[in-house]
Amino acid sequence: MRKPVIAGNWKLYKTTSEALELVNELIPLVKNASGVEIVVAPVFTVLSTVKNALKGTNINLAAQDCFWDEQGAYTGEVSSTMLLDAGCSHVIIGHSERRQFFGETDETVNKKNIAALRAGLTILFCIGETLHEREENQTFTVLERQISGGISGITKDELKNVIIAYEPVWAIGTGKTATDDQAQEAHKFIRGVVAKLCDSESAENIRILYGGSVKPENVKGLMAQKDIDGALVGGASLKADSFAHIVRFSE
């Protein structure tokens, strides 16, 4: 049985005081939530502060990106081992905004995936097609390329610490959401690609999250789908009550 994951990507929001206010509101709202893995991903500058606030709670800490080398002359970068040192257990890699604005490629995403896994982090590995690619019927081609490139060189054992997040780029921050059927179709395909590249056991066990305008109003329908194992939440994770509602989708 795959344990659902609800992860909040705070993106470039929340100063230290705002982040503390948010987690302090969130903690009591989700403390009794069972059967779900909860993750929040603040900006780098507040990771240690948020980690201290989360001590003894059921909420895991993630970073929004990492670099592929452990150390070196890479101005502005943060390594996986540094994230671990800051108290992170998870890291988001390959988000479409990183691909779009910062030139992430399947190759650089793969290097980051491997570095994070070997440092001991669980990765939230993001994939997804643009509106143009969907309209050109390229969705499955793009997803297979991204998965194949992203998990190249990753062992079956390491794959246990990989969570895939499917985020159709056209649904991120637009208010548009894939229908339940569209999301399930993509998730089923993704699981099939993992089976083809690895094996059926790995495919059955890997958790695949949906991301793209997930809200309290649509989470139940998405989570009712056979191959959807959770959500990577953007805007709705910036308010404690809406994120808690998503975390408690099964209640």
Curated annotation (Swiss-Prot):
Ranges annotated as spanning the membrane: none
Record-listed E.C. numbers: 5.3.1.1
Keyword Isomerase: yes
Keyword check for Phosphoprotein: no
Catalytic reactions of this protein: D-glyceraldehyde 3-phosphate = dihydroxyacetone phosphate
Alphabetically ordered keywords of this record: Cytoplasm, Gluconeogenesis, Glycolysis, Isomerase
Listed Pfam families: TIM
Highest taxon, organism lineage: Bacteria
Pathway per the UniProt entry: Carbohydrate biosynthesis; gluconeogenesis; Carbohydrate degradation; glycolysis; D-glyceraldehyde 3-phosphate from glycerone phosphate: step 1/1
Active-site residue numbers: 95 (electrophile), 167 (proton acceptor)
One GO CC term on file: cytosol
Gene3D superfamilies tied to this protein: Aldolase class I
NCBIfam families registered for this protein in UniProt: tim
Family: Belongs to the triosephosphate isomerase family.
Function noted in UniProt: Involved in the gluconeogenesis. Catalyzes stereospecifically the conversion of dihydroxyacetone phosphate (DHAP) to D-glyceraldehyde-3-phosphate (G3P).
Name of this chain's protein: Triosephosphate isomerase
